[in-house]
């Protein structure tokens, strides 16, 4: 569909980068002036530009111009945005299992509002691999998408093609939610921590390896109240109101940061950062990032593609500080599956890790094991902010595409064919039970 796109360039005064978010192999950013940019892998429509092309540099998502977007969030291969003024939640990308919330499982190559959420005031949105959640201003939670392990919190294992309210939170005001591959976590306004969904590695923090179909409160926090939570692929990170960091779940690659490879079934305080006040956290597929109140960024876990950002490709079992030019302080971080994004106080955006599909936004498809400035989004870039613009021709761009048109279902080692996780290239070792669908 590249021939249907008229590409030019937008040069404007520097705009503040408000939000960054990293998916499996794509990235998005929200800039002041109501500009949404996306880049990286586009095969499933997750970039929203009306085609299936990869983009190695940030490209303005013209379909959302004028919609006054206030948040953007990446799932693995889909994206969700919220317009506060219009009270609309938009979604696009890979649609299998209903993760787009439109009542079907088709892929969508341009943003479309979710009818079931029209008119609802949204406070926060979280996207996992194949499911999504939205927290309303009233503290209620809506969930939709894949639910084979109960990650929607609805009390069953049926996928939901449209958002449904989590009834288990009736009378409980939720502050925020986080979504992993097949599990979910939440923090209440009162600082209580909850987990539900797939719990095989202790990633629910409930002291066992059992799935939960409805949210269950985590009681083993030593009396600490939590202010935030984030989910990696199969691990979970939380921060208390005192700024202490806790991790639990899968630790095969050191992603819990405790200096070993042991899983933890309950929240375990990360002593290596006990002298720091943690202000933000993010979980990748097998790596973790934590930002301190004084602008220092620490990373640990799986580092095959340099996604930890410390200048090598060795796994890190304990936190290591990520260094930036001129010791710039970091104000925001987001982990993708195998890449990481960060924004500094000077309004510069950096990326590192896997770059095969252009998800680093640096204009080329190469890996980086240390922070590389995204010149198109950064004030300190060689030419300042210089964002490409794609103008979609609505008469010729893609809209709905059924997954059956582009994928074949293959059996796993048990002979079953009802699995989920789609591979993103042959460069990774994915458990056989995770690979059930392949492109044709």
Swiss-Prot record:
Cellular compartment(s): Nucleus; Cytoplasm, Cytosol
Effect of residue 283 to E: In uvr8-5; loss of response to UV-B
Keywords of the record: Acetylation, Chromophore, Cytoplasm, Nucleus, Photoreceptor protein, Receptor, Repeat, Sensory transduction
Inactivation phenotype: Hypersensitivity to ultraviolet-B (UV-B) illumination. Abrogated induction of DHU1 in response to UV-B. Disruption in a plant lacking DHU1 alleviates its hypersensitivity to UV-B.
Consequence recorded when altering residue 285 to A: Loss of function. Constitutive monomer
Cited Pfam families: RCC1 (PF00415), WD40_RLD (PF25390)
Assembly and oligomerization: Homodimer in the absence of UV-B, but absorption of UV-B induces monomerization of UVR8 and interaction with COP1. Interacts with RUP1, RUP2 and histone H2B.
Effect after changing residue 94 to A: No effect on function, homodimerization and interaction with COP1
Phenotypic consequence of residue 92 to A: No effect on function, homodimerization and interaction with COP1
Gene transcribed to yield this protein: UVR8
Protein's recorded name: Ultraviolet-B receptor UVR8
